[in-house]
Amino acid sequence: MRLNTIKPGAGSKSAAKRVGRGIGSGLGKTCGRGHKGQKSRAGGFHKVGFEGGQMPLQRRLPKRGFVSLTAARKVEVRLSELDKLPVDDIDLLVLMQAGVVPADALSAKVVLSGTIGRKITLRGIGATKGALAAIEAAGGSVATA
């Protein structure tokens, strides 16, 4: 096999639909658009959600709630990721420097995923019940604030 002989698998690629190339193609003359009307013209499509002048559904329904900007900056950290860190005293800054959480993270929470085999101390980081039990079983502790 050489680079110049590589081909896609048989039947994996279909030929492009060529329109306006004669009656025999089945897509000649009007190119599958039918006769006249807005949809047959170039640029003849209305915007998404347009209902012909009727008040659109997205404007008829009331607005509700909002998208929290801080929700995306709350990060989950696995227990197995903490086990790989070289330090025993772990806070949010340590996690950022190690690249475990992104630099714009506002808070972190440890979840029970994997195991921990050494004593660590968490400072200012939340932990689930399972993660807390695993950390304490390994001789570690969680200090709030």
UniProtKB/Swiss-Prot annotation:
Keyword Ribosomal protein part of the UniProt annotation: yes
One Gene Ontology biological process: translation
Entry keywords, A to Z: Ribonucleoprotein, Ribosomal protein, RNA-binding, rRNA-binding
Cellular component terms per the entry's GO annotation: cytosolic large ribosomal subunit
A Pfam family it matches: Ribosomal_L27A
PROSITE patterns for the chain: RIBOSOMAL_L15
Superkingdom to which the source organism belongs: Bacteria
Compositional bias (Gly residues): 21-31
InterPro entries, per the entry: Ribosomal_uL15, Ribosomal_uL15/eL18, Ribosomal_uL15/eL18_sf, Ribosomal_uL15_bac-type, Ribosomal_uL15_CS
Span list, region Disordered: 1-43
GO MF annotations in UniProt: rRNA binding; structural constituent of ribosome
Known role: Binds to the 23S rRNA.
Family per record: Belongs to the universal ribosomal protein uL15 family.
Quaternary structure and partners: Part of the 50S ribosomal subunit.
Name assigned to this protein: Large ribosomal subunit protein uL15
UniProt organism field: Aromatoleum aromaticum (strain DSM 19018 / LMG 30748 / EbN1)
The gene coding this protein: rplO
